[in-house]
């Protein structure tokens, strides 16, 4: 039976710009907003868009990500005709091959895609924060009779050189594409979200592999090839909230924006929920000493200090006289008595010892996964 569209989430990135936060886990598994992981947004968009089959392509440090996704039940992807599959590099008759780029990861999973037999494939990045109706994008793809549709976002001209930039005609047909140009001619930036007619993409990737032609990356190789070949390539304009959280500063900034109850992400919209795998935790405890202002405090937290404009993730602890300001405290982290934390991201399971002062005013301060700061070695 032919399925209309299969979603493939590229979730194998190492995320080196996030430093300590991704030393032990893949970037899409990094926590966000107190109760989510970054990949939850792409998975939830799929669920809300009525996409029943999702493949998650992993590579770097996949354990936490695999555990988080499980059988997909948190996103309703565990039914009879639905499913989520974890796709990792594997050994084939030609030998072991790591994914060499975004489109190479798709080529390496042709057998899986063929088993789903989709008419269209939706390619997504697993490390962006946004809400989007992919069904609306698919309808645009059909209306334009496109071979490829690229989701685009208007960005400030000064930031355009960080993205793949498209020039379009009056009908939004893409006539030129430049990957991270020094002098961009447009401000229409690729969001790394693509809809392809599967058979056309499949044929191109197979021919390129047999001919030893480099087609390993969508931005550098595939999109330019489509344009040169005269394929119908269209832009789908997106005007909602979208955040690339690939740096410490952008991740911190997105979390701070999320605190606002009227945030641009519209997090309280019940018609487009963001789902996640949430373990059952005890209720929060706020002592008589606790002072919490303009903050998000998730289940299982213990607060005996002061928290201002910050996020406390599941099971975080803030001991007596500790002060947290403009910071993200991830799950299970412990902030010791009298510690002072300002403009920082404290990783999962980290311990900040009594009296330690962290000030990220000049540059957001990061404490890594299970890292201990100020803890004597004999107590380590």
Swiss-Prot record:
Pathways per UniProt: Glycan biosynthesis; glycogen biosynthesis
Pfam family, one: NTP_transferase
Entry GO MF terms: ATP binding; glucose-1-phosphate adenylyltransferase activity
Keywords of this entry: ATP-binding, Carbohydrate metabolism, Glycogen biosynthesis, Glycogen metabolism, Nucleotide-binding, Nucleotidyltransferase, Transferase
The reaction(s) this protein catalyses: alpha-D-glucose 1-phosphate + ATP + H(+) = ADP-alpha-D-glucose + diphosphate
Enzyme Commission no: 2.7.7.27
Residues at which alpha-D-glucose 1-phosphate binds: 164, 179-180, 190
Keyword ATP-binding: yes
CDD domains recorded: ADP_Glucose_PP, LbH_G1P_AT_C
Superkingdom, taxonomy of origin: Bacteria
GO biological-process terms attached to the record: glycogen biosynthetic process
Keyword Transmembrane helix: no
Matching NCBIfam families: glgC (TIGR02091), PRK05293.1 (NF003670)
Family, as annotated: Belongs to the bacterial/plant glucose-1-phosphate adenylyltransferase family.
Matches recorded under HAMAP family: GlgC (MF_00624)
Functional description taken from the UniProt entry: Involved in the biosynthesis of ADP-glucose, a building block required for the elongation reactions to produce glycogen. Catalyzes the reaction between ATP and alpha-D-glucose 1-phosphate (G1P) to produce pyrophosphate and ADP-Glc.
Subunit structure, as described in the record: Homotetramer.
Name by which UniProt lists this protein: Glucose-1-phosphate adenylyltransferase
Protein species of origin: Streptococcus gordonii (strain Challis / ATCC 35105 / BCRC 15272 / CH1 / DL1 / V288)
